[in-house]
Design a protein with these regions (language model features):
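Catalytic machinery of carbohydrate-active enzymes
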Residues: 1-143
Length: 143
């Protein structure tokens, strides 16, 4: 099921290859192996805040999401929080019926959906997302 609907970490490399970007993990499960693989394979550190309980402290997670310039995700829980606080959110997704399409939800006006057919490879989607972010990157609010 996961392989059909969610991309393997290796497919995210176009996004991780965008220069001068800091990456933050928003997943609430233990993805230490994936984060280590990104570091080992791509030389990119994805920061994970050990002191933030991303499962139970929804207010703190929402505050973190609000502090981001942009979020890239699949259709998982962090997407709901980033879009709810107004953070521009790029979603890598497979095409599906419109009955559950987040774009019809007015809370999610900050969402850009990048869709593929269910059995197509993910690389085209992540290349498009990386290109889109690269065009917008200079307008982000840096500290």
């Amino acid at each position: 099921y996961r392989l059909k609907h969610y991309p393997p970490i290796s497919e995210w490399s176009p996004v991780f290859s965008i220069p001068n970007v800091t990456f933050i993990n928003l997943q609430y499960k233990d993805f230490a192996d994936d984060l280590a693989k990104i570091k080992d394979d791509l030389g990119i550190t994805v920061h994970h805040f050990e002191d933030l309980n991303q499962y139970d402290d929804i207010d703190d997670v929402a505050a973190l999401c609000n502090a981001l310039d942009i979020a890239v995700t699949t259709k998982v829980t962090p997407m709901i929080l980033t879009s709810a606080v107004g953070t521009p959110t790029k979603i890598a997704n497979w095409q599906q019926s419109t009955w559950n399409n987040i774009l019809t939800n007015p809370v999610s006006s900050s969402v850009d959906m990048f869709e593929k057919n269910t059995w197509e490879p993910w690389n085209k989607i992540f290349n498009l997302i990386a290109q889109d972010i690269s065009k917008q990157k200079d307008s982000f609010n840096h500290f």
